[in-house]
Amino acid sequence: ALISKPETPAELKRLWYAFRDVEDGCTYTAEKLHDLKKIDALDVWRKARLAMDNNRPRAARLALNIESTELGKQAILIQADPQKYLDKRLLAITKKRKELAVLALIRVANTDPDKAAQLVDKKWGLMLTKEEHNWVWAVIGKQAAQKLQDNAHSYFNKVSRNQDLNDDLLIWKTCAALRQGDWKAVVASIDAMDGGKQDTT
């Protein structure tokens, strides 16, 4: 009865995204919402992206298990050696292969954002959708910003649509723009954030 309320699926999805560690109750609820078509494949993939970005491989695996256990197994391989995972895959044609490549690129970016940027520029960027492309560049920019790299802002500038990003990535995009004095980018990033997260003071 709870998840039949119109506002509940969105709120539960938000909570599911927010949990960095695995919560059995949240995972179970997400599975049921998926069965009821209240969350879709992109929602599941975004949860896996967030988990991989936060170095929570088990959470990524459990999220992908909602789609299929085989996808969950791929998360384990990506976590173990993302570069090897990408090297073994020449093409990413299907939606699932593209998203798995996104997870691997996120994992590479965690340790070496410049290396991840090279991989996107030389090969993988051509195979990804616009949304995937924007998310990956934002993660690369975030990791570079956390390392106080001067090129973080240039990575974020490769994002063509701020609305494809979540608030966490937009916050880091704002920080990188502030460091470079790019006020136009600062305003654009803040405007793209969820209304409840903006600080207007």
List each model region and its residues.
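Generic helix N-cap/helix-start motif at coil->alpha-helix transitions
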Residues: 1-10, 21-28, 36-46, 54-63, ...
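Residue-level signature for tetratricopeptide repeat
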Residues: 1-3, 50, 107, 143, ...
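Non-catalytic all-alpha helical scaffold/repeat segments
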Residues: 3, 11-20, 31-32, 86, ...
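Inward-facing hydrophobic residues that define packing positions of alpha-helical scaffold repeats
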Residues: 9-16, 63-64, 120-121, 153-157, ...
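Charged, alpha-helical scaffolding/interaction elements associated with membrane systems
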Residues: 54, 111, 179-180
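Membrane-embedded hairpin module used as a gating/binding unit in multi-pass transport
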Residues: 66, 98-123
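Glycine-centered coil turns and helix-coil junctions that link the paired helices
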Residues: 144-147, 180
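Extended non-membrane alpha-helical scaffolds
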Residues: 153, 174-178, 182-189
